[in-house]
Amino acid sequence: GIQVDADAKSGTATILVKQKTGERAVFFERATATEPEFLEAHKQLIESAYILHINGRHRQLMRSAMAVAKEVGTIISLDGGAQRYDEDMKAITEDSHIVIVARDYAEKYTGTTNLEDACRIIHERGALIAGVTDGANGSYFVWTDGTSYRCEPFSQATVVDTTGAGDSFHGAFLYMLTKTLCKIADGTNTSTMNETSLSLNAIDLLHSCEHEDLEKAATFASAVAALNTQGIGGRSPLPSLEDIKALIG
């Protein structure tokens, strides 16, 4: 459930959008609430999940959640947004299994402006799947076996608002990845199941993903992010599956 601090204020973001380009500036007022408490209910959710998705906020709580995920084999997915990297995030990034970050984060974390090299460095530092997003220029990936992939962008004639493009990219990628993990898991739940397949956790399943499935997830995410720029706000322009499929073709 939601933890409520009755005497505190929630964080508030004011977003200004440039009408001609859809570029935005964010002014953020931090919450005055105390750090959320890590509860037994959180632990149980993580233990039953394929993926724990984090973004670097509420770090004490996040580290507790990551510890549980590592213990039970739940995949840790990190969204490294622009202007969000600091030295404290280095260890968190290295401890995450899926690391998909914005260009700004990647450059600060790796020390290079070459995004293909940055993606490779992220992978070499521990990420099973490494990704760097670069807005209208597309994205770069390195899969679990070290194979590189360049995901082309879906260019739009006009961009209304880029708010939420990164969040929608992450959500869409993990949506498609989870579908693949479920499909692989269902394949083990057959009459041929043995002791090895019984012990498979989410990280084991991630290693079993085919390149084609991962590329489809990246393409799907790119399409969702592109369509999400066609309206004001981060949520209201989220597209339907029909619109996504129509764009991908």
Language-model features: where?
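Beta-strand->loop->alpha-helix junctions that form or flank phosphate-binding loops
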Residues: 1-10, 81, 121, 131-134
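Conserved N-terminal subdomain of the carbohydrate kinase-like
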Residues: 1-50, 245-249
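Proline-centered loop/turn at the N-terminus of a beta-strand
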Residues: 13, 75, 98, 128-129
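Short gly/ser/thr-rich secondary-structure transition/capping motifs
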Residues: 31-37, 78-84, 112, 205-207
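Acidic, amphipathic alpha-helical patches
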Residues: 41-42, 89, 118, 159
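Structured loop/turn residues at beta-strand edges in well-structured enzyme cores
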Residues: 44-47, 87, 94, 125, ...
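Conserved beta-alpha-beta core of the PfkB/ribokinase-like small-molecule kinase fold
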Residues: 50-120, 137-139
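Conserved phosphate-binding/catalytic region of the ribokinase-like
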Residues: 114-249
